[in-house]
């Protein structure tokens, strides 16, 4: 086995051991879902990856954002709060750069509006709940997205931010994360079913942090498109990893005790989108053909090394089904 693969296996083992430690810390809770849904491919979710139209979307943001602020006061207030916080952090950057715990510098192409969007999403406000509820329905039709989805700017900026943060990560780029949900038990279609999480899904690198959000359903997830956003969150102690709505997963194990929580273990498969560049197509492609890059639309298989890591994780889950770190 090559040394990088061996080191990756070691890192996974260390991560699993850390998950078994019972360490607690204060955390601000954010309810993630408001209704019960089956865990499936979430076909009504709006899953645009903006392949081939990122520059055109960026150019359209000023007018689009102004219009959306007028339609949603919660969105406008959260964005204002996040903008203020981002400016404060930028002013403190010289001080942070001397600290051993300083955040990593943003990746190439990461702009201020990406940082503001992530801060707005993680703020202790109703925005993330309203936004994800809208994302889960905006893909029911192209017309519904164009005429009724009032978070086009936020969806684009979060999507592009995760793409940039993901491309800027050092290997390994996949992460073992945990996700706790309060007041809702998800029901997967069955073992080995292919599913998506339906919206922008918050998870944590720390098992204990995820528990604070609930245990009615508790996920163990291998994500390869989710990106750590600790340095762009109002609550860095959560060690949050944000997963985009177009990442696909395979259900490798699921259980539900009679009076206990549902436990679901997912491994990354790739990505799948029904939509691409819908806003730009509507605004600029009516008078003639558009040439957009659709390379990001389909499924992308995992590497052999990551498949081996996922197998190792599954074996640990099977060996310790009731371990406190794998709830």
UniProtKB/Swiss-Prot annotation:
A lipid is attached at residue 295 (GPI-anchor amidated serine). It catalyses: L-arginyl-[protein] + NAD(+) = N(omega)-(ADP-D-ribosyl)-L-arginyl-[protein] + nicotinamide + H(+). GO terms for cellular component: cell surface; plasma membrane; sarcoplasmic reticulum membrane; side of membrane. Residues 73-273 form the TR mART core domain. PROSITE patterns: ART (PS01291), TR_MART (PS51996). GO terms for molecular function: NAD+ poly-ADP-ribosyltransferase activity; NAD+-protein-arginine ADP-ribosyltransferase activity; nucleotidyltransferase activity. Its EC number is 2.4.2.31. It is a lipid-anchor; GPI-anchor. This is GPI-linked NAD(P)(+)--arginine ADP-ribosyltransferase 1. The gene is ART1. Coiled coil: none annotated. The keyword Glycosyltransferase applies.
């Amino acid at each position: 086995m090559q040394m990088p693969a061996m080191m990756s296996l070691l890192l996974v083992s260390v991560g699993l051991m850390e998950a078994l430690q019972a360490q607690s810390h204060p955390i601000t809770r954010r309810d993630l879902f408001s209704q019960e849904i089956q865990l499936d491919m979430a076909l009504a979710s709006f899953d645009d990856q903006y392949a081939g139209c990122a520059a055109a979307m960026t150019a359209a943001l000023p007018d689009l954002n102004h219009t959306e602020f007028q339609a949603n006061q919660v969105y406008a207030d959260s964005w204002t709060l996040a903008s203020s916080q981002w400016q404060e952090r930028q002013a403190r950057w010289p001080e942070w750069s001397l600290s051993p715990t300083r955040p990593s510098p943003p990746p190439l192409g990461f702009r201020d509006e990406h940082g503001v969007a992530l801060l707005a999403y993680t703020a202790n406000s109703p925005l993330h709940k309203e936004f994800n509820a809208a994302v889960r329905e905006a893909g029911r039709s192209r017309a519904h997205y164009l005429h009724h989805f009032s978070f086009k700017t936020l969806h684009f900026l979060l999507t592009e931010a995760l793409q940039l943060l993901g491309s800027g990560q050092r290997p390994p780029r996949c992460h073992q994360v945990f996700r706790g949900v309060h007041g809702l038990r998800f029901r997967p279609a069955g073992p080995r079913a292919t599913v998506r999480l339906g919206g922008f899904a918050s998870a944590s690198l720390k098992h204990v942090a995820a528990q604070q959000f609930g245990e009615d359903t508790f996920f163990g997830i291998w994500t390869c498109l989710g990106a750590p956003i600790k340095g762009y969150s109002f609550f860095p102690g959560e060690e949050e990893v944000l997963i985009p709505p177009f990442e696909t997963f395979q259900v490798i194990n699921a259980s539900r005790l009679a009076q206990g929580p549902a436990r679901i273990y997912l491994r990354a498969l790739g990505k799948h989108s029904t939509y691409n560049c819908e806003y730009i197509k509507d605004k600029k492609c009516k008078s003639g053909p558009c040439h957009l890059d659709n390379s990001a639309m389909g499924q992308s298989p995992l590497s052999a090394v990551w498949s081996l890591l996922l197998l190792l994780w599954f074996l640990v889950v099977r060996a310790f089904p009731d371990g406190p770190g794998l709830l």
